[in-house]
Amino acid sequence: LDEAINTAGELKFSLPLQKRLDSNIYYVLIPEFHGNDFLMFKIISEDVQKDRVEYSAVESAYDELKSYEYIKDIRPHQMNAAQMLQQVLKNTRWSLGYVEDTGIQSTTFYYVTILEAIQKIVDLFKVELTFTIQLDPVTQKITGRRVNLYQQQGRRTGKRFEYGSNLLTVTREEDSQNLVTALVGRGKGVQVSGQDTE
């Protein structure tokens, strides 16, 4: 699992060839590191080797939240992060999860995707974002999709990671996550007052 702050996580895993996933399986859930929820990943590639099958998957929430209709115009005024997030998630199947107390801010969401609005909230309040899934242990069905905002995940260890002269391998990866299938055209955005002038 490759995890970065406020970006889609990536999951790579492999199975023996005889345990290859059915072609109708598109998503994989793994337990969250802290808590009883799960992280959900969408399988984006399958690479069949001699005796193994390697899979690559990305966190599915990012794609889903980009696919909802655009927010045309919401102007939250003097709200905390939870209140803004609740407005943004109103027409989705996602809800508030754990959201830390934040100060209050004002902003504007104008012709942006749900995901762009969430990222604007994250930047505005300087918080860290995760998406979690709740699963019924008996029926194995998804019962909830949560958006969580933390002041800080994990802890600071003072350790530093670098790569340089002792590099052993380099891997080239191609990514089709930000593929655009539709565009929304907009005009100049001139504000018009109450009188209709011809």
PLM feature spans:
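Surface-exposed cap/loop segments at beta↔alpha junctions
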Residues: P16-E100
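Short beta-strand/loop turn elements enriched in aromatics
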Residues: L1-N6
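Amphipathic, non-transmembrane alpha-helical segments in extracytoplasmic/periplasmic proteins
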Residues: F13, A57, Y70-G97, T108-L135, ...
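Structured loops at beta-to-helix junctions and adjacent beta-edge loops in soluble globular domains
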Residues: P16, V58-S60, Y150-Q152, R186-K188
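A generic structural signal for beta-strand entry/edge sites
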Residues: A8-K12, Q49-E54, T139-R146
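Short, conserved phosphate-binding/catalytic loop or strand-edge motifs used
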Residues: W94-T107, V138-R145
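Extended amphipathic alpha-helical segments with heptad-repeat/coiled-coil character used for oligomerization
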Residues: V127-R160, G164-S165, Q177
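Acidic, small/polar-enriched beta strand-loop surface segments
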Residues: Q153-E198
